[in-house]
């Protein structure tokens, strides 16, 4: 808490200061207390998925697993009896993890997942519709290979944006293969993670953004598989 407190001698000092952290400050001479409003939103360490819903009356499949062989009653047949997330937060509210959901309103909805051992289950989002953006947080270090059940994020035809945190060390075979509508892939890792085969194939030839300081390292990295996508690699703006 002490790191979030700042003392000023005058109101002028407070007005001139830039506070971009959660802060409570006070001015000794004027006996004033200020509550700074520039506190950033804490970064979520698990998987964040943005779903865009046109028809709130339709029950959709959020992810694969936890239902019967068809994923429960939904408009998608891509369910299955795989592992459930450990926790699930729907639009800021903690909910019991379940793979089908009926949103009450149209528009964008945010669902956040955490997993046992911070491991994304195999084929977790394979063929899932309505998902437009994915953010993989710092608690997750690997994206699994595809297996007989499918790819972790394969064939998500409405997906336009993927952001992968700087903690990632391995991106598995076929991880995003078949996401034909992708517009951007952002990888924040300053050390190129090992890349599985066909991980970014069939992804609309979209740009792959990496930290500016390591663009050349990514482009020239044959041992980790990144050189295959060298023409698409650009610096994060």
Predicted regions, residues:
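Structural signature of tandem-repeat unit edges
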Residues: 90-91, 108-116, 129-142, 154-170, ...
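Extracellular/surface-exposed low-complexity repeats and stalk/linker segments enriched in Gly/Pro
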Residues: 1-24, 32, 184-197
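Noncatalytic modules at the cell exterior or secretory-pathway interfaces
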Residues: 60, 102-113
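Short, surface-exposed terminal/edge motifs of secreted or surface/virion proteins that either
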Residues: 21-44, 216-223
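Short, solvent-exposed S/T- and G/P-enriched segments that are highly enriched in secreted/extracellular
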Residues: 92-102
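Short, aromatic/basic amphipathic alpha-helical patches
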Residues: 198-199, 216-230
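Consensus positions within tandem repeat domains that build extended binding/scaffold surfaces
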Residues: 146-152, 172-177, 197-199
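Extracellular ectodomain segments of secreted/surface proteins
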Residues: 42-82, 117-140
């Amino acid at each position: 808490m002490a790191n979030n407190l700042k003392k000023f001698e005058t109101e002028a000092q407070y007005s001139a200061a830039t506070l971009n952290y959660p802060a409570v400050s006070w001015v000794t001479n004027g006996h004033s207390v200020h509550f700074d409003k520039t506190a950033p939103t804490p970064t979520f360490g698990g998987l964040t998925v943005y779903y865009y819903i046109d028809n709130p009356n339709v029950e959709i499949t959020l992810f694969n697993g936890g239902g019967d062989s068809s994923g429960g009653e939904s408009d998608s047949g891509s369910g299955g009896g795989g592992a459930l997330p450990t926790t699930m937060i729907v639009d800021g509210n903690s909910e019991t993890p379940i793979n089908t959901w009926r949103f009450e309103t149209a528009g964008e909805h945010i669902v956040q997942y955490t997993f046992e051992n911070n491991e994304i289950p195999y084929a977790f989002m394979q063929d899932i519709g309505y998902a437009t953006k994915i953010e993989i947080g710092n608690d997750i270090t690997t994206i699994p290979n595809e297996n007989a059940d499918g790819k972790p994020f394969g064939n998500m035809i409405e997906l336009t944006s993927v952001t992968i945190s700087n903690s990632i060390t391995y991106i598995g075979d076929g991880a995003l293969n078949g996401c034909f509508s992708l517009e951007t892939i952002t990888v924040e890792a300053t050390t190129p993670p090992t890349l599985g085969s066909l991980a970014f194939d069939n992804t609309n030839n979209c740009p792959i953004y990496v930290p500016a300081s390591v663009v050349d390292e990514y482009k020239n990295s044959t041992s980790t598989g990144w050189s295959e996508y060298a023409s698409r690699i650009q610096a994060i703006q």
